[in-house]
A protein has these predicted regions:
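Glycine-rich anion-binding loops of enzyme active sites
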Residues: 40, 47, 80-166, 266
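General beta-strand structural signal in soluble alpha/beta enzymes
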Residues: 21-23, 41-43, 115-119, 158-159, ...
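Active-site-proximal betaalpha loop/short-helix elements
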Residues: 92-93, 172-238, 268
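Residue-level signal for inorganic ion chemistry
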Residues: 30, 70, 78, 116, ...
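Acidic, Ser/Thr/Pro-rich beta/coil linker or hinge segments at domain junctions
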Residues: 255-293
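Helix N-cap motif at beta-to-alpha junctions
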Residues: 245-251
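Small-aliphatic-rich amphipathic alpha-helix that forms the alpha element of a beta-alpha
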Residues: 59-83, 100-111, 179, 183, ...
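Extreme N-terminal cap/leader segments of soluble proteins
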Residues: 1-58, 77, 86, 103-108, ...
Length: 293
């Protein structure tokens, strides 16, 4: 079992209602609101002790990461966050830890205009900690970008730098590309978009697969974080940048208006999800059901 297969299974297990524009499989679900020109975006994400943060990490840092990685999903759809539900489960959970964690969540939410409207707290039978945030946001009709909408000839573009997120501390200090997501969502030149959490290669391949296309990387154009190799950039994950498929006819104007956007490859006709232009790799992108090295 891997994440991709599990997701495909879930698509068949859970039927969708007519108002669901996008169900399982993208950065957020998308719901049509009767009588409104806005779309409702829903996402949920976790921070698990020992998986997403090291044991003993400060509660404020955990809180910031939890909020920001959810905001990154909203950004990837071209929307803005609005309301959140918070769940905490752990053993042990001290009053001091919970107080610092909740204050950290509030500060992070306030930064992005999010109102926490409820949640739950529970113990665990064994030592550990799981923090979950469900986030609701909104996007304008026509500004939502799906990962499955890349077209042949589109350029693979991305914000920011890649690689060595854990070693550099970026996975705790990153800022979700919210304003960039709104900007890119409004551009007709952007056909598809998603955030990068499991590794640039794995997530870009997902976009190609969902779009029924192959992907050709131009690795010499991938912006590298300090000390990172091309392999690190392709495989490390936890970058929380945005990648998008851009119409080549509009790419120059888009990159001029948004200098932080780099061209890293292109989508082409071919076996869906196949990738060329990359070196031999020893690493793999992140998968919760496999050993990650």
């Amino acid at each position: 079992m891997d994440e991709e297969r599990l997701l495909e299974d879930l698509k068949h297990v859970f039927p969708q209602r007519p108002e669901v524009a996008v169900g399982p499989g993208d950065d957020t679900a998308v719901i049509r609101l009767p009588g409104s020109d806005r779309l409702l975006l829903l996402t949920v994400d976790q921070v698990v002790g020992g998986v997403h943060v090291l044991p003993g990490e400060a509660p404020e840092r955990i809180a910031e990461k939890l909020v920001r990685r959810n905001v990154s999903d909203i950004a990837a759809m071209g929307g803005r966050p609005a309301y959140a539900m918070l769940t905490v489960a752990g053993k042990p959970l001290s009053e001091e830890f919970l107080g610092a964690f909740h204050r950290g969540v509030q500060r992070a939410c306030a930064e992005y205009g999010i109102c926490v409207v409820g949640g739950d707290v529970s113990s665990l039978p064994e030592e550990g900690a799981v923090f979950t945030l469900s986030l609701l946001g909104f996007a304008e009709e026509g500004c939502v970008k799906l990962r499955r909408s890349a077209r042949p000839g589109d350029l693979l573009c991305g914000t920011g730098c890649y690689g060595r997120s854990f070693e550099s501390g970026h996975h705790l200090t990153f800022r979700p590309r919210l304003q960039e997501g709104v900007f890119l969502g409004k551009s007709p030149a952007v056909h598809a978009m998603m955030d990068v959490s499991d590794g640039l290669l794995k997530d870009a391949r997902r976009m190609a697969m969902e779009s029924g296309l192959a992907l050709r990387f131009e690795c010499e154009h991938i912006p590298l974080r300090a000390g990172a190799s091309v392999e690190d950039a392709l495989c490390d994950g936890e970058d929380y940048e945005l990648i998008c498929a851009v119409d080549p006819a509009g790419a120059d104007a888009l990159c001029s208006a948004f200098p932080n956007l780099s061209r890293m490859g292109c989508f082409v006709n071919g076996t869906p999800g196949s990738v060329s232009g990359i070196p031999a790799l020893n690493k793999k992108g992140f998968d919760h059901f496999h050993e990650n090295v």
